């Protein structure tokens, strides 16, 4: 099995609910290690750049507005099959469709305020990790 790194963001809704520790506990219980982490309040420019892939989608403006509405917790998760593991922990994008016990089923309010973001593929993960953690501030554990 390959050790991977993936980007995870705990979104403003979940940060406001004070569930960062509960979400981190789920990552660690699944065998994922936090290799880098920081809290940030994204600027509009950062959010627009990060979600540029969605620029032409009808939800783009609402997504950017939501992501700049409060602080987020950004982390790099590391472990065997980290990308898939994180996506399984998160659950479906729409919390109404998310399996019981997933992060979104337990902490998200809507498809927009859905608690977490996670990279969807190895290539995406590499780009997303570099966006928020350029340079050498990620630590193998």
Swiss-Prot record:
Q: Which residues form a coiled coil?
A: none
- Subunit structure of this chain's protein: Homotetramer.
Q: Membrane-crossing residues?
A: none
Q: Identify the keywords attached in UniProt to this record, alphabetized.
A: ATP-binding, Cytoplasm, Kinase, Magnesium, Metal-binding, Nucleotide metabolism, Nucleotide-binding, Phosphoprotein, Transferase
Question: What is this enzyme's class at the first EC digit?
Answer: transferase
A GO term for molecular function: metal ion binding
Q: Where in the cell is it found?
A: Cytoplasm
Q: Which residues bind ATP?
A: 11, 59, 87, 93, 104, 114
Query: Superkingdom of this entry's organism?
Result: Bacteria
Tell me its cofactors: Mg(2+)
Q: Which residues form the active site?
A: 117
Q: Which GO terms describe its biological process?
A: CTP biosynthetic process; GTP biosynthetic process; UTP biosynthetic process
Q: What is this protein called?
A: Nucleoside diphosphate kinase
**SMART domains, alphabetized:** NDK (SM00562)
The record's listing under HAMAP family reads: NDP_kinase
Which InterPro entries would you find in this protein's record? NDK-like_dom, NDK-like_dom_sf, Nucleoside_diP_kinase
In terms of Pfam families, this protein maps to: NDK (PF00334)
Q: Which gene encodes it?
A: ndk
Q: What does this protein do?
A: Major role in the synthesis of nucleoside triphosphates other than ATP. The ATP gamma phosphate is transferred to the NDP beta phosphate via a ping-pong mechanism, using a phosphorylated active-site intermediate.
Task: Identify the EC number(s).
Answer: 2.7.4.6
Q: Which reaction does it catalyse?
A: a 2'-deoxyribonucleoside 5'-diphosphate + ATP = a 2'-deoxyribonucleoside 5'-triphosphate + ADP; a ribonucleoside 5'-diphosphate + ATP = a ribonucleoside 5'-triphosphate + ADP
> What PROSITE patterns does the annotation carry?
NDPK_LIKE
Q: Where's it mainly located?
A: cytoplasm
